[in-house]
Amino acid sequence: VTFTPDRNWLNEASRKFPVVIDPVTTTSKAATDIEDAYISSKNNTDNYYNNENLWLKGGNEIRRSFLKFQLPEIKTGDMIVNARLVMVSLGENGAEKTIAVHKVIQSWESKTINWDNKPIYEETVQDLCKFTADKIKYVVMDITRMVKEWYRDGSNNGLMLKEIDELSGSVQLMSSDWDSS
């Protein structure tokens, strides 16, 4: 998650200069500060929290991925104007994919989540990312509204990623447990 200042806010006629802008704040990338796991409809009681990959899949086995971040501390008066989720897709079969991100509204733990106990999530899609899964590439999604809500009401239950149609194919993303060595 990365926060950046809003250009329209900076260009408002009422803005007094010099403007003090705090640096961009980024969440920790340490595996201990990120909870992530994927779930499978086919293996509905299995847990995949300690896997190097997060999967999204459609067809006869639906897979969805869940992520939750320890948010950086911000001061009173700080304003969140932009928050992005940036992940790495490991490529697949060259098919065009569309990933949807949803806000999770029920508590969950990465070590115990499975298909049968998956948390409730908002049906409203926060953002979509369309890309061709043909090589390693960054997948970037706007999660500004969700992050603002997490800070405002303390309801950080994370997010869920899924393929938009869940009809066929799969997407493989790096998890926080990816071994970069």
Regions found by a protein language model. Give the residues of each.
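A short beta-strand element within beta-rich, extracytoplasmic domains
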Residues: L67-F69, M79-E92
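Terminal domain-initiation and capping elements
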Residues: V1-T26
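Beta-strand-rich interaction/scaffold domains
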Residues: S89-N157
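Flexible, small-residue-rich N-terminal segments that precede or flank a structured functional core
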Residues: F17-E73, K103-E109, N117, Y121-E122, ...
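Residue-level detector of buried hydrophobic side-chain packing
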Residues: I21, F69, A83-L85, V101, ...
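Short glycine/proline/serine/threonine-rich loop/turn segments at secondary-structure transition edges
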Residues: N11-F17, T76-V81, K148-N157
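Short edge beta-strand/strand-turn motifs with a hydrophobic/aromatic core
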Residues: F3-P5, W9, L67-P72, M141-T144
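Beta-strand-rich interaction surfaces with strong enrichment in secreted/lumenal proteins
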Residues: R7-L10, E52-G58, L71, Q126-T132
